[in-house]
Amino acid sequence: MPRLRPKPNATPDDLAFGINPCAMALSAGLVRSLSYLEETKNRRVFDLVDRAREEGIAVQAVTGPRLDELTAFGVHQGILVRLKTIEPVDLAQVAREAATASLVLLLDRVTDPQNLGAVLRTAVAVGVDAVVLPPRRGVLLTPGVHRASSGISFVAPVATPQNLAMAIRTLKDAGYWIVAADAGEGSTSATEFDWPARTALIMGSEGEGVGQLLLRESDFHVALPMDPRVESLNVGVACGALSYLWRRRWPLAPRSD
């Protein structure tokens, strides 16, 4: 009977593994050191090793068992990096300097790394100005999030204020309207909602939704219209749909280049 491997949930937060996350970490200038599988024949791994050496980053070849141990048997594809500190963005500064049309995402009790990874990919694709992650009410940037986002987590504008109530006050002071995703009675259909130019969108976990305190702090509640046989959507999927509804109302300015 094959031995079951433990899930990669015991790795330190200053690690990333897998080809795409490691490549993004290198591009973002966040790599302190790199380890790779000594018997690898993967050309993409060799390319990343060469890049790291050219940038003066410490590189080490390790055995397969050692790489498995370092990643807690995660799907590492033969490469792992240790990270520098990922500095959060200053939410107040972002709010002050954002364009007239600006979207900020606030995540309440989102604990699944896969969901956060999906949200961060959506955020960068849509052009969100900040993703607010409260330190005590959900998952932060972990190896699982880096892998789920294919490394987009290294370039996503993540803010980590003390709590979401404080973040909401900061955003309201900067002219944002607070919109909560809520499937409860009285919510406006998200497809018919007139999205404000400056929107702070609160997303809750699939199981619990947005907390009551945050719902009371919100200016509007919106819900995605769905077939009644579907009780709820994954927060990553719902966030993508709502973010693009906002972007449809407030398109990105054409690139000058």
Segments the model singles out, each with a brief description of its role:
Residues 23, 28, 125, 144-152, ...:
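Structured adenosyl-cofactor binding patch, chiefly the S-adenosyl-L-methionine
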Residues 179-230, 234:
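Active-site/ligand-binding-proximal alpha/beta "capping" segment
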Residues 1-96, 255-257:
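N-terminal positively charged helical leader segments and presequences
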Residues 77-80, 147-152, 196-199:
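Short, hinge-like loop/turn segments at secondary-structure boundaries
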Residues 18, 108, 115, 232-234:
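Active-site helix-initiating loop/hinge in glycosyltransferases
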Residues 23, 30, 40, 47, ...:
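RNA substrate-binding interface of SAM-dependent RNA methyltransferases
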Residues 85-87, 136-138, 207:
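Short glycine-enriched loops at secondary-structure junctions
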